[in-house]
Structures are given as C-alpha cells and as structure tokens.
Amino acid sequence: VIRYGIVGVGGFAANWVRWLEGLEAAGQARLAAAVVRDPAKHAAEVERLAARGCRVYPTLAAMLADGGVDVVGVPTGIAQHVPLAAQAMEAGYNVLVEKPVAATIQEVRELQEVARRTGRWCAVGFQFIYSPTIQWLRERLASGQLGALLRARVAIGWPRGARYYARNPWAGQLRQGDTWVLDGPATNATAHHLENMLYLVATQGGGAIASVRAELYRAGPIASYDSSCIEVLTEGGARLLHVASHTLEETLEPVMEVECERGSIHWEAADNSAIVRYADGREERRADPDPDEVHARPLAQVARVAAGLDPAPLCGLGEAEPHVLAIDLAFESSGGIATIGPEHVAQGTAGDGSALVRVEGMEGLLRQALASGRMFSELGAPWARATRPVAARGYGRFPGNEALARALGGV
C-alpha cells in the first residue's frame, strides 16, 4: 500500500485526509504522515490521526528527513505549491500537488527544471482528468472518428459569498506576500473546466495555445476578479471559451459543449457524464460509474504510478502548464481587472448564508455565452469592455510588461 505524507490537515487538506482514509479502506493507499504547523489548532485531528498510526511533524523538512512515505502531497494554498513541491523533489520524493500548480508560467517552468534535474515527477490534482469519462472523451478525439476539434465552450455559475473569501488569507487576492496567486474563478474554483478543454484539444495536431483574449471583472470587495471570459485559440485553429462567475445567486453547474468536424460532445460535471454524437447519426454515452469518487481519483492514480502499476500521472506538469499559461495571458489581454460599477450590482445571499455581491443579469449572460460562444462584451453587457488577444509565442514571465504590473498593484 502506497504511503502518502501530506502538508496540512485543515482547510482543503482535510478533504485529502478523508479521501486517503477511503483509499486505505479500499487497500489502495494510506496516510502515513502529515505536517501540522499548528498542532494546538488541530489538536483533536492530530490525536485522531496519531491513533490511526499517522506520524505528525511540525515541518516538511522533518517529515522528509524521517522518510517512511512514498509520495508527498501538497494540498496547500497556491503560493506554497511550487516551493514545497520543489523541496520534496529535491529530497528525492515524487509529488502530487493541488491545482493550480502555480499562478505564473515561470514558476511552472522552474518546477519542470527541478523535475528534470532530480528525476522525480510532480502530478497535479485536476480531478476530472483522472476520471474515466474525460479519459474516454480523450480517446474518442484521439481516434480521429470525430475529426478535428473546432470549438469548445463551458459556462459555470458558482455563487461565492463573504465566507468563501474569508476562509484563508489569499482568497480573492492577487498576491500572498510577494508571491502571485491571481485567485479567481478561472484560476482556481472552476479551473478544472478550462483545463479539461486544454487537455482534450491537446489530442489534436496544433493543440498548443496560440493566443488568449480575456475579459476579467471585479464586482465584489476583493483585489482579484470574480467574473471572467477567456477565449483560447490554438495553433491548429480551435477556439475554446471558458466563462465563469461567482457573482450570482443561482448555481449553474458546468456544462461543456464541443464541436468537431464529424460530430459533437456534450459533457456535464454534475454526474460526470458525456454524450458523443457522430455526423452519421451514431450516438455514444458514458456515465461515471461512481461520480462521488472523482475527488479521490488523483490520489488513487498517483498511488498506482508510485507502485509501478501505471506508467505516469495522467496530469503532470506538462498537462497542467497550459492552464497556467492561459491564466497569465488572460491577465495580459485584459490589462488588469475592470470594475463593474455599483449601478449594476446588488446584494444577495450565498448558499452558506453569507453576504454575496450579485451582478444583475449574470445568470442570463452565462447561459447566452454557453449557447452562442460569445463573450460578455459581445453579448452587450453594459459594464463589459472588449479586449485584444495576446500571442503565446515567446511568453515566459508574468507580468509581461510594466503597465500590467502597475495595474495589478506593483512589480
């Protein structure tokens, strides 16, 4: 049984603890060690884990020095992903890091260099990539039966209120200390659904990003953005559109529509199900046999890699890099974040009961974007502003110019 050592047991890391305990019951992996920087804060959980045979350490360095783990997990805040993953890889460990791997393309490439130098690998926890449904869709596209992927689009409306933004020091922020986090719906909460499209289009010749055009907006009292439209054009000519917002009261679960030369794909996140329709009238359906297990699948597949049963993580740094590049170029294209004026905003309530900033008409805009493939400015939203595409070729460092650095509050 593969032994995990993870950094943290509170916040989002508490989910990893639960998922690993489920995998332990199934005989696939177990939580052998955990880093808990503030054991007094998590006293009950530390006691419970110790009773289960999990060793608890005050620092990652102490856990790495003691050994006894096969994979190091990093379910921490965005700013800590790269330094902690690099520390573990330098010590000889393979790593699974939570998504996104980083906020900037230079950090991803630094970590890729660590992987090359150490011979270790770093998997990234984009959960749907590890699911049988997305893998099945990737196989269908790679087979050529659908022809070239022409267009893909996804729209997501996930209400997020004051409690969401108060849950940690970097939620809704551009930076944590001196490190960029660029938090926002496309960067973090709905990142999976941008990554899914980038992962699927990578089966095509010319699947690399050619340019990005984006509109980033802020309605709430945060530093970063809470609504976004991101258009990605690939070198092969495919157009991908990701539209998302936290500024609404009605939940719109992710739906992805894909148009190909010889058919189409309809995918829904709620039950991780897909329908493939071919131009000749054939239809195939795939439902996830256990959609509730989607969150634990990265941990399970990485354990199989560590055990020598699978050749490589389904989502490594190479697969996760395009998402980070798309986010960085989105900020470059938008030139910062546009504020939605108070005349278009109202107060609402999130599902957790906390106060929420609501943009009037956002639900309808998201539905229109999914149906038409148009961006907020193209749909005539009164607060929206059009932007220009930015080329990906040669881009290697965020922010790419001083004007953007100033717009985001410093270099």
Region roles according to the model:
Residues 182, 188-313, 324-332, 341-411:
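Contiguous beta-strand/loop segments that form the cofactor/metal-binding neighborhood of enzyme cores
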